[in-house]
């Protein structure tokens, strides 16, 4: 999942698993000088142990990654995108969870996924980029971002109607 991580991830370390451990830099929750601080959006300067950060859908156990303000995070994720589709791993592509929710704006999301596609396709032109999307995917499928989508609502709506006669399952 590229739009958030777990609060236990070494980048955040809310559970303080890595705090004081040899070989680990302090997490962004633990120390304002953490090398990972820019990976997250904090709303206060309450360190140590700053609980005031964006969580995916408001969940503090799922800290939302802050691509817009961290070029180092972007570059790190782009390298991951390339690494796994290259030798010796040679995976066939990427399945992107909640891809349209990556950043804080649709405009930024489109910019990032264009960069991601370019990086992945440079490493492996045949790699597939499959994104989870739950709205109209047309703007993402213009040949410069995702190759295809999986859409739970588009699948569930007709199945639910067929099985139950209920027109919408997601109200």
Each language-model region and where it sits:
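Active-site and adjacent substrate-binding regions of carbohydrate-active enzymes
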Residues: 1-171
């Amino acid at each position: 999942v590229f739009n958030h991580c777990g609060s236990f991830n070494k980048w955040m370390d809310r559970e303080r698993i890595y705090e004081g451990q040899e070989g680990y830099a302090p997490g962004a929750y633990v120390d304002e000088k953490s090398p990972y601080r820019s990976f997250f959006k904090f709303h206060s300067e309450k360190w140590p142990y700053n609980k005031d950060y964006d969580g995916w859908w408001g969940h503090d156990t799922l800290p939302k990654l802050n691509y817009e303000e961290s070029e180092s995070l972007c570059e790190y994720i782009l390298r991951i995108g390339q690494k796994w589709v290259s030798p010796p791993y040679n995976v066939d592509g990427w399945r992107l969870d909640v891809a349209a929710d990556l950043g804080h704006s649709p405009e930024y999301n489109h910019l990032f996924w264009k960069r991601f596609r370019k990086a992945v396709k440079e490493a492996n032109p045949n790699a597939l980029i499959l994104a989870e999307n739950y709205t109209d995917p047309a703007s993402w499928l213009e040949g410069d971002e995702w190759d295809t989508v999986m859409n739970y609502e588009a699948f569930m709506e007709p199945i639910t109607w067929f099985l139950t006669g209920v027109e919408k399952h997601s109200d």
